[in-house]
Swiss-Prot record:
The chain crosses the membrane at residues 20-40, 87-107, 124-144, 147-167, 174-194, 207-227, 289-309, 327-347, 356-376, 392-412, 430-450, 456-476. Residues 1-19, 477-514 are cytoplasmic. The keyword Transport applies. Disulfide bonds: none annotated. This is Sugar transport protein 3. InterPro entries: MFS_dom, MFS_STP/MST-like_plant, MFS_sugar_transport-like, MFS_trans_sf, STP/PLT_plant, Sugar/inositol_transpt, Sugar_transporter_CS.
Length: 514
């Protein structure tokens, strides 16, 4: 008994304190390029929608309204409704329809053949979409390109977070997994830089859309050389010897027997067949299922994609011109990327729940204050004075910083680490699918909501920030420094979830915390 307890304690220290090897860093940097393609797409779509030549070619009605508004500056009936076009909204949100379908298909690929094939398929699909988008001649080609991009994003978003969380030692899992959100920020920032530089070029929008092929090519080619994760090897092949060799290479030590034992035990109940989705519905996985649904939902109703998609549009609404709005969006991108980098440095020290709390309160204050400014402007014929316009930019930066070190990276990190191996792939697919559903809903609803409710849209998302901040503090256990195959035991010790989860066939660990 004493010997067994000593083994568990030694294992916990070994796994949680594992060092970061160059092999792990190189593999994770390459895999995280999946985040760059996602971030680039978010940034580029919002930017090209503020480019006159792009609107004139594909969305002439929107362009005409925009020109009329320029001639009649101060007409409060136009400012908030300029981009309320179903066709334009379809361009933005079509990606998430195909992404939803793709991520469900990616679950089977990731579960049966490994994380690496899904990453490769994501890169190939995104590359095809970038090529078609850059050469689009009509709206149909443009939307087909978006659908292909969606397939790429669906495969990448399903597989990359799993890859990062499984490759990382527990002690550094938060930092490494947050690299996915950092790469989303880098992609978003890169798109804003390119949009700003190409705005005055006749066909600059083509350059912006086609440049997405660069990160897609890197991801596609790089995935050919990626190693598979030890967790995936044991799940897909059952080859214990091969898994042990990869563990030694990943951890940089030959002392991996305890972690290998945990992987073998975790894989014993792993499904690689069509029953995986049904298994997720079992009562013992109720906490994981709930989190797979609510975390991506909460991430979207922070309102971040309203800012990401429509930041240039929002800045034009509050009084900036095309160039000024793109520059303001560029500044926002720099702030978001920097805050995510900060999150990587502190997430494994102060924990997930603390960052959720700080970021949630920060975003709440920003949303409400922006809403008040827009509401005051509405009283004065919808004209926002220049000083207030700059205040909106500052508040958006504060908001984006809050998201960048909380719901941005943690919305991907936490789901990727809380699922046991036997349902990890399918649960991650559910998480990404829910994210796509509500991203689509936000993209569809934001323009008409901004048009109809104006300031009310900011209070709407502010209300959700209150709900999610309280919910996370009450119902999410802290996973800081807990080995990934031991996280499952946290639910049995949680004040709420322990009442509805059956005892699980896992070994207890001495470092479980709440």
């Amino acid at each position: 008994m004493v010997a067994e307890e000593a083994r568990k304690e030694a294992m916990a220290k070994s796994v949680s304190g594992g060092k970061i090897t160059y092999f792990v860093v190189a593999s994770c940097v390459m895999a995280a390029m999946g985040g760059v393609i996602f971030g680039y797409d978010i940034g580029v779509s919002g930017g090209v929608m503020s480019m006159g030549p792009f609107l004139k070619r594909f969305f002439p009605k929107v362009y005409k309204l925009q020109e009329e508004d320029r001639r009649r500056r101060g007409n409060s009936n136009n400012h908030y409704c300029l981009f309320n076009s179903q066709l334009l909204t379809s361009f933005t949100s079509s990606l998430y329809v195909s992404g939803l379908i793709a991520t469900l298909l990616a679950s089977s690929v990731t579960r049966s053949w490994g994380r690496k094939p899904s990453i490769f398929l994501g890169g190939v699909s995104f590359l095809a979409g970038a090529a078609l988008g850059g050469s689009a001649q009509n709206v149909a080609m443009l939307i087909i390109a978006r659908l292909l991009l969606g397939v790429g994003v669906g495969f990448a978003n399903q597989s990359v977070p799993l890859y990062l969380s499984e490759m990382a030692p527990a002690k550094y899992r938060g930092a490494i997994s947050n690299g996915f959100q950092l790469c989303i920020g880098i992609g978003f920032l890169s798109a804003n830089v390119i949009n700003y530089e190409t705005q005055n070029i006749k066909h600059g929008w083509r350059i912006s859309l086609a440049t997405a092929a660069i990160p897609a090519s890197i991801l596609t080619l790089g995935s050919l050389f990626l190693p598979e994760t030890p967790n995936s090897i044991i799940q897909t092949t059952g080859d214990v010897h091969k898994t042990e060799l990869m563990l030694r290479r990943v951890r940089g030590t030959n002392d991996v027997q305890d972690e290998l034992t945990d992987l073998v035990e975790a894989s014993s109940g792993s499904d690689t067949d069509s029953n995986a989705f049904l298994k997720l519905l079992q009562r013992k996985y109720r906490p994981e299922l709930v989190m797979a649904l609510v975390i991506p939902f909460f991430q979207q109703v922070t309102g971040i994609n309203v800012v990401a998609f429509y930041a240039p549009v929002l800045y034009r609404t509050v009084g900036f011109g095309e160039s000024g709005s793109l520059m303001s969006t560029l500044v926002t991108g720099i702030v978001g990327t920097s805050s995510t980098l900060l999150s990587m440095l502190v997430v494994d020290r102060i924990g997930r729940k603390t960052l959720f709390l700080i970021g949630g309160l920060q975003m709440l204050v920003s949303q409400v204050t922006i809403g008040v400014i827009v509401m005051v402007a509405d009283v004065h014929d919808g004209v926002i004075k220049e000083g207030y316009g700059y205040a909106v930019v500052v508040l958006v930066c504060v908001y984006v910083a809050g998201f960048g070190w909380s719901w941005g990276p943690l919305g991907w990190l936490v789901p990727s680490e809380i699922f046991p191996l036997e349902i990890r792939s399918v649960a991650q697919s559910v998480t990404v699918a829910v994210s796509f559903v509500f991203t689509f809903a936000v993209a569809q609803s934001a323009p008409p909501m901004l048009c109809k409710f104006r300031a009310g849209i900011f209070f709407f998302y502010g209300g959700w920030l209150v709900v999610m901040t309280v919910a996370v503090q009450l119902f999410l256990p802290e996973t800081k420094n807990v080995p990934i195959e031991k996280v499952v035991g946290l639910w049995e010790k949680h004040w709420f979830w322990r009442r509805m989860t059956s005892k699980r066939d896992i070994q207890e660990t001495t470092i479980l915390s709440h």
